[in-house]
């Protein structure tokens, strides 16, 4: 099983950050955070972009994939993963299928399916359903590749993840403000996309 132990001084810093965030909405350094943005947000944005090019699935795929990095550059909230690590330098090669690991996979799977379902519900028509699905899927894909990279940190995956970490916001929003900001952002993108119909 992947060790989640942290040096004592890092655990202390994370406790201090958590105590500060319980008192008020805040931003904390992502240096000690290895979670991910809600996949549903990425899927909704990818679906919204795909709805603008309903007859061009290849363009939807490229734009959806690129949108992931643009959104990750914005400070946002992450949900915690108990066993899977996705931070810089993460290594999941010794990950075992414990209850914590299965819970993490279940949460991520529900998140991804919910995002795909919402994207299809909000944007898909009879003639664009596959394009919307492609846009939503590719918008979530970089986080899946990030996990694959923790298992096989080589080649193009390594170069992609270096870029992913570089562009990713180093500040994290917390609490209700963090959750609300993502809901508001996804809603705003959806409204903007539908205004072009």
Question: Where do the language-model regions lie?
Answer:
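N-terminal non-cleavable signal-anchor helices
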Residues: 2-3, 29
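N-terminal membrane-targeting hydrophobic helices
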Residues: 25-197
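Short linear motifs in low-complexity or flexible loops
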Residues: 3-5, 14, 18, 24
């Amino acid at each position: 099983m992947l060790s989640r132990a942290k040096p004592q001084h890092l655990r202390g810093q994370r406790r201090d950050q958590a105590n500060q965030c319980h008192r008020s909405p805040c931003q904390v350094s992502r240096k000690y955070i290895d979670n991910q943005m809600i996949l549903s947000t990425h899927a909704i944005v990818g679906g919204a972009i795909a709805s603008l090019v309903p007859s061009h699935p290849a363009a939807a795929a490229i734009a959806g994939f690129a949108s992931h990095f643009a959104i990750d550059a914005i400070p946002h909230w992450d949900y915690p993963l108990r066993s899977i690590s996705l931070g810089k330098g993460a290594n999941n090669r010794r990950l075992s299928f414990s209850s914590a690991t299965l819970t993490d996979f279940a949460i991520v799977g529900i998140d991804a399916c919910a995002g795909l379902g919402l994207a299809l519900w909000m944007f898909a028509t009879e003639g664009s359903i596959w394009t919307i699905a492609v846009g939503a899927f590719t918008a979530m894909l970089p986080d899946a590749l990030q996990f694959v990279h923790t298992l096989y940190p080589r080649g193009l995956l390594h170069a992609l993840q270096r870029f992913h970490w570089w562009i990713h916001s180093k500040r994290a929003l917390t609490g209700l403000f963090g959750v609300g900001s993502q809901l508001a952002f996804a809603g705003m993108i959806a409204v903007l996309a539908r205004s072009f119909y």
